[in-house]
Amino acid sequence: MLEDTTIHNAITDKALASYFRSSGNLLEEESAVLGQAVTNLMLSGDNVNNKNIILSLIHSLETTSDILKADVIRKTLEIVLRYTADDM
């Protein structure tokens, strides 16, 4: 996976990136989930915007059978949605 700095710089929503950057270890698991979503978007050549991050997280949520991982994905999705204006 890419370094956190690269991932945060790739996110077009700077407030969202700043939130995760400043969270430290408090959101370590959620940061890892977000990082994986951003990495997947970058590797596929998609724009790293909130809409695509949300779609990626929903896909991850739908395809995981691990209840604990699903909870972390859901928390990550909730954070991204909080930072997403009505631009969807």
Curated annotation (Swiss-Prot):
Deleted gene: phenotype? Deletion increases biofilm formation.
Kindly state which keywords UniProt assigns to this record, in alphabetical order.
DNA-binding
**Keyword Secreted in record:** no
Q: Does the keyword Acetylation feature in the UniProt annotation?
A: no
InterPro entries, from UniProt?
AriR
Q: Which GO terms describe its molecular function?
A: DNA binding; protein homodimerization activity
Write down the Pfam families for this protein, in alphabetical order.
YmgB
Q: What induces it?
A: Induced by low temperature (23 degrees Celsius). Repressed by the autoinducer-2 (AI-2) and by indole. Induced by 5-fluorouracil. Strongly induced at 16 degrees Celsius. Expression has been shown to be independent of RpoS and dependent on RpoS, repressed by YcgE. At 16 degrees Celsius with blue light irradiation expression of this operon is absolutely dependent on YcgF for relief of YcgE repression. Part of the ycgZ-ymgA-ariR-ymgC operon, it probably also has its own promoter.
GO BP field: cellular response to acidic pH; response to hydrogen peroxide; single-species biofilm formation
Q: How does it assemble?
A: Homodimer.
Q: What does this protein do?
A: Probably a connector protein for RcsB/C regulation of biofilm and acid-resistance, providing additional signal input into the two-component signaling pathway. May serve to stimulate biofilm maturation, via the Rcs phosphorelay. Regulates expression of genes involved in acid-resistance and biofilm formation, including the RcsB/C two-component system. May be a non-specific DNA-binding protein that binds genes and/or intergenic regions via a geometric recognition. Also confers resistance to H(2)O(2).
- Please give the family membership noted in the entry: Belongs to the AriR family.
Name used for this protein in its record: Probable two-component-system connector protein AriR
Q: What is the lineage of its organism?
A: Bacteria, Pseudomonadati, Pseudomonadota, Gammaproteobacteria, Enterobacterales
